[in-house]
Amino acid sequence: MRSTSLLMQAKAAIPDIKQLPTKHKVSLAYTIHWPHKTVNPNINIKPREPVIFLHGVFGSKKNYRDYCQTIANQNYTPVYSLDFRNHGESEHAFPLVNYSTLTQDVVDFIHEHKLEKVDIVGYSLGAKVALLTLLKHPELCRSGVIIGNAPIKTPQVKVYLKAFIKALKALGDKRPEIKSNDKAWRAKARDVMRKYIPDGDILHYLLRNIDIRKPKNITEYKPGTINFSMPISHFDNKVVEDIADWPEEEVEGLKFEGPVRVIRGTQSVFINDKGLAAYQKHFPNYTLTNFNSNHLIWAERPLQVTKVVSDFLKKTRLLEMDGSAKALEESPKESYSRPPAHQQPLHKNDFTHIDVGALPVNGAQAESTQA
């Protein structure tokens, strides 16, 4: 309690850090991707069950617009793509990324929009929120597609989350030097962050949180310079711990009996043997699709991943939900002449070329390789 009080006092003493409200309910920003009309105007197609799409940490709904539209078109169904609290265009508030809070935000969204039996698709951070929604509110969900994460604690990701936050905060410190009317503002921002995140794909992903315009619901706006769509000044070790966490006690004994497709990058350690065992325990009707990819599956295999998602939704919608979920054909396992994913150091696979040594936390690298 004392450390929390001291942290709040320190933040209050810094003029650029705005205090955030504590809200247990936040109305999430969203985009509905409606299926494009059929070329035959005489055919009236009624949209089927809605799909909810949940993005990853430091992401937003705008990152996945094309994929969501493709899924909507191919399944003749609306896709609701959401922004989590403190991401994209959604409101900034405490708690920042607590899984129980994020899940309740999604459940409130489903109720507010009077959606029934949704198919829920989640990637990375969104994958864990999707899993928790399926387990705690099975009456609201028909199926799930889980990409790049598992229902377990993932301490191995902490070192990389710290690197991402450190890079974004370093850019925040340089804001007065980067003017919004400078045509090279994005290149200058990239140069600041490259010291911590040399990988081009990750840099591009993180830079999607920065704009020269005033984003919606922003709490730390400065005219004339770059601005963040996230309250990055408040992202600290508590955020890192929350993202790596999983509420094991909260889901003990819970199962989701509907169909679930898990999409795994075989070069990633996010879904290891322990993760697969947890899937079997909580999601007895899950099936697995492997990709020769790291954790950034959407960046490496965008068309293939989108096809797997669409094909799964089509197939499950043809099945009678009377126990026939097991009729789903499990994708063939791909074999690679490499050690099992959980025995590999994360920095050689999931987030290439991140300078782990530049991080300020002692022992973080050992933690990542031992998990």
UniProtKB/Swiss-Prot annotation:
One of its GO terms (molecular function) is transferase activity. Pfam families: Abhydrolase_1 (PF00561). InterPro entries: AB_hydrolase_1, AB_hydrolase_fold. Residues 325-352 are annotated as: Disordered. The active site is at 124 (charge relay system), 295 (charge relay system). Keywords: Hydrolase, Transferase. The keyword Transferase applies. Disulfide bonds: none annotated. Residues 327-336 have a biased composition (Basic and acidic residues). It comes from the Eukaryota. Its EC number is 2.3.1.-. Probable alcohol acetyltransferase that uses acetyl-CoA to synthesize acetate esters from various alcohols. Not involved in the synthesis of ethyl acetate. Belongs to the AB hydrolase superfamily. PANTHER family: PROTEIN ABHD11. This is Probable alcohol acetyltransferase. It comes from Cyberlindnera fabianii (Yeast).
